[in-house]
UniProtKB/Swiss-Prot annotation:
A single MF term (Gene Ontology): dTTP diphosphatase activity
Record localization: Cytoplasm
Name assigned to this protein: dTTP/UTP pyrophosphatase
Pfam families recorded: Maf
Named cofactor requirement(s): a divalent metal cation
Residues annotated as the enzyme's active site: D77
Alphabetical UniProt keywords: Cytoplasm, Hydrolase, Nucleotide metabolism
UniProt lineage: Bacteria, Pseudomonadati, Bacteroidota, Bacteroidia, Bacteroidales
Keyword Cytoplasm: yes
């Protein structure tokens, strides 16, 4: 599939094993390339829906000087947004606990921004999914944190893990977006390269 991509070397610029797994599911050959210490800050003035795309574009710009003419780069960033604002990745157990406690018994938004870039083209998009969590008890939150240590995940949880099985009541939107890469939309966009 996607014969148009055969002219490119596809590069996924991500440390995320979930993004690697999801992109593999599209049956696209790619390599992973990671630059450490990319600035993931954003201006306070931008809307929450724009934050992930802003960061995904910043990541792409960091890679641009090293890109070969035949490379197609994919970058992404995911945030969790609640009534209290943006949740990124928790720095420690205490932050992860506070995040899960805040998500418990509420609906939150998961927004992923994706940037696809070649030397001549740069396309970006965002996908939003609403996730409804059941009420989580302290015992359930502590069990999850002790066993899964979700410190590399926006909002402090992985929907594909135990907490998703027992805590997610409903999703409106893409499940794969909540995992970190909206592969259906990505596939549609890749058709145009």
């Amino acid at each position: 599939m996607l014969e148009n991509l055969k002219k490119y070397k596809i590069v996924l610029a991500s440390n995320s094993p979930r993004r690697r797994n999801l992109l593999s599911g599209l049956d696209i050959d790619f390599e992973v390339r990671v630059i450490s210490d990319i600035d993931e800050s954003y201006p306070d003035s931008i809307d929450s829906m724009e934050i992930p795309l802003y960061i995904a574009r910043s990541k792409a710009e960091a890679y641009k000087p090293t890109m070969a003419d035949d490379e197609l780069l994919i970058t992404a960033d995911t945030i969790v947004w609640t009534f209290d604002g943006v949740m990124g990745k928790p720095a420690n157990r205490e932050e992860a606990y506070a995040m899960l406690h805040a998500l418990s018994d509420h609906v939150h938004q998961v927004i992923t921004g994706v940037c696809i870039m070649t030397k001549d083209k740069n396309v970006g998009f965002s996908v939003e999914s609403a996730v409804c969590f059941a009420k989580l008890g302290d015992e359930e939150i502590n069990y999850y944190l002790d066993k899964y240590k979700p410190y590399d995940k926006a909002g402090g949880y992985g929907i594909q893990e135990w907490i998703g099985y027992i805590g997610v009541e409903a999703i409106n939107g893409s499940f794969y977006n909540v995992m970190g890469l909206p592969v259906q939309k990505l596939y549609q966009e890749l058709k145009h390269f």
